[in-house]
Amino acid sequence: MTSADSLLFTSLGPSPSSGDGDCKFNEEFKFILLPLSYAVVFVLGLALNAPTLWLFLFRLRPWDATATYMFHLALSDTLYVLSLPTLVYYYAARNHWPFGTGFCKFVRFLFYWNLYCSVLFLTCISVHRYMGICHPLRAIRWGRPRFAGLLCLGVWLVVAGCLVPNLFFVTTNANGTTILCHDTTLPEEFDHYVYFSSTIMVLLFGFPFLITLVCYGLMARRLYRPLPGAGQSSSRLRSLRTIAVVLTVFAVCFVPFHITRTIYYLARLLNAECRVLNIVNVVYKVTRPLASANSCLDPVLYLFTGDKYRNQLQQLCRGSTPKRRTTASSLALVTLHEESISRWADIHQDSIFPAYEGDRL
């Protein structure tokens, strides 16, 4: 067994008080799965998000509120994928980290920063869509781009502030020539880390996920009401696609990771037997790449829900000169025909929902 393998229990196994000090994790799969999966996420994530950022910055301005959320979502994904080459090297080198303790802390911090910023930006999009479909008058007041920009800034700062303790928990540990970059913390601090991590999970994933489910449930009920007109059917279809894409990202990327991580932490805290710990550890490690894959799935949201974004991207891929800047409007609204609402909307021409027609990016 190599020195890295002998250290696996130190970073991943139960705390010393568990009495299972002889439990060794068989993690050979990790040294193949994680480098390959992170490399794929890096290539695809950069290829998908870099053009997205370029289009938002140079071809789809001025932004509406939803485009603002999507730009920040793409920015978060891009920053994360740029850190992945170091993790590819780390796991390919069998848990050897030569980049220093500070960069170890930064890379682990960046993983959760991207994860929870993505969750909150998707939640912002969900609430914004819910307001536009179910409460259009309120959406005009609260859905302005300036408000969305301030909210995005708040998301960045709040998530970063909540994750500051992670910078103290995460560290490196040397054993001979092998240096581990812990994804949690040292064994003696693991109990405290679990309490911190669980609190963060409830605040930055549990509540936002619940809000997203409620918003999309109410939206789906509203959208399935029969409305005359082909244009409205097209708007409803785009909105339903939005629901499907966002819930798919949650179901594939976020939910499995948080469930398996919670089980993994509980198994260690409850001093589960070694066989159970090994099974839980394998399942948890398999879901880590899924959490990273949100950087590749998020751009699907822009493609499925925005006609103008899709057209601009097609022109970019064909090498043709894109049309001059157009207003970015990422998601469609259901057309509302109430005369009083239309008159009210005409007064607010600077709103992001002009005349309540279906917005198309």
UniProtKB/Swiss-Prot annotation:
Residues that carry a glycan: 175
Family affiliation: Belongs to the G-protein coupled receptor 1 family.
TM region positions: 31-58, 69-91, 109-127, 150-170, 193-218, 243-265, 284-305
Ranges facing Cytoplasmic side: 59-68, 128-149, 219-242, 306-361
Name used for this protein in its record: P2Y purinoceptor 4
Gene Ontology biological process: cellular response to prostaglandin E stimulus; transepithelial chloride transport
GO MF terms held by the record: G protein-coupled purinergic nucleotide receptor activity; G protein-coupled UTP receptor activity; pyrimidine nucleotide binding
Tissue note: Expressed in the liver, intestine, stomach, bladder and lung.
Superkingdom as given in the UniProt entry: Eukaryota
Membrane-topology annotation of the record: Multi-pass membrane protein
Modification note: Phosphorylation of Ser-329 and Ser-330 is a key step in agonist-dependent desensitization and loss of surface P2RY4. This phosphorylation does not involve PKC, nor other calcium-activated kinases.
Keyword Signal in record: no
Topology Extracellular: residue spans: 1-30, 92-108, 171-192, 266-283
Gene: P2ry4
